């Protein structure tokens, strides 16, 4: 059976995981899997009442939502039910809904299964929160990116502004702190670095500097699709 290469990039919101995954994917000619987008899209598809649904009903609702991954690098495209995922998932509302639903074992196991199926069929760069610890514990290369919440909020504000989405900075900072608390204190797959992950603080580093560090650890001969 062919061994696919898995590179995981974990960390809280606003540390640059998506940008790093896209650029790294372009350099290494690998698709990148945005698992945060999967959580957000699933949360929006299920609606704001999903958190209170019984496990049996929630499980049936999840089965109606499927994901597919196409392309490589910056051209990687995550599809939901055969359609591309839009900017609607980048709202803070979607982020909070996703964090709340992340407390449900049914949700985490459903998406974990899809993510592992994708990783079994191709080499990927996967970014999220618990990939190195829960989803791909045997990944060949693991990174955990962190940064000061104030800096992360400013980055998020700038990112949303570029996308034409205007939100109050203080609301974004509050949302980040709230989500950090949920992510770090949940009983199921809490946000924490894998024991064998490379830890990088991106507070005072630009993307290119972080990429250089990551590429120093990634040995190209291991890469195979």
From Swiss-Prot:
It is found in: Cytoplasm. It catalyses: CMP + ATP = CDP + ADP; dCMP + ATP = dCDP + ADP. InterPro entries: Cytidylate_kin (IPR003136), Cytidylate_kinase_dom (IPR011994), P-loop_NTPase (IPR027417). One of its GO terms (biological process) is pyrimidine nucleotide metabolic process. GO terms for molecular function: ATP binding; CMP kinase activity; dCMP kinase activity. Its main location: cytoplasm. Belongs to the cytidylate kinase family. Type 1 subfamily. This is Cytidylate kinase. It comes from Lawsonia intracellularis (strain PHE/MN1-00).
């Amino acid at each position: 059976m062919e061994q696919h290469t898995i590179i995981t990039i974990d960390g809280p919101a606003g540390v640059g995981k998506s940008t790093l995954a896209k650029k790294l994917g372009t350099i290494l000619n690998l698709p990148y899997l945005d698992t945060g987008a999967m959580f957000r899209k699933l949360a929006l598809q299920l609606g704001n009442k999903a958190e209170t649904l019984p496990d049996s009903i929630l499980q049936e609702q999840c089965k109606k939502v499927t994901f597919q991954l196409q392309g490589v690098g910056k051209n990687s495209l995550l599809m939901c039910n055969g359609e591309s995922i839009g900017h609607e998932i980048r709202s803070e509302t979607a982020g909070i809904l996703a964090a709340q639903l992340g407390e449900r074992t049914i949700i985490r196991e459903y998406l974990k299964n899809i993510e592992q199926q994708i990783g079994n069929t191709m080499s990927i760069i996967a970014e999220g929160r618990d990939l190195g610890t829960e989803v791909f514990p045997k990944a060949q290369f693991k990174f955990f990116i962190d940064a000061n919440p104030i800096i992360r909020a400013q980055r998020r504000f700038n990112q949303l502004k570029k996308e034409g989405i205007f939100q109050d900075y203080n609301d974004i900072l509050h949302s980040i702190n709230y989500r950090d608390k949920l992510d770090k204190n949940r009983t199921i797959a809490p946000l924490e670095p894998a024991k064998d992950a490379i830890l990088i603080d991106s507070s005072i580093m630009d993307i290119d500097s972080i990429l250089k560090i990551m590429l120093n650890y990634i040995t190209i001969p291991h890469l195979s699709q």
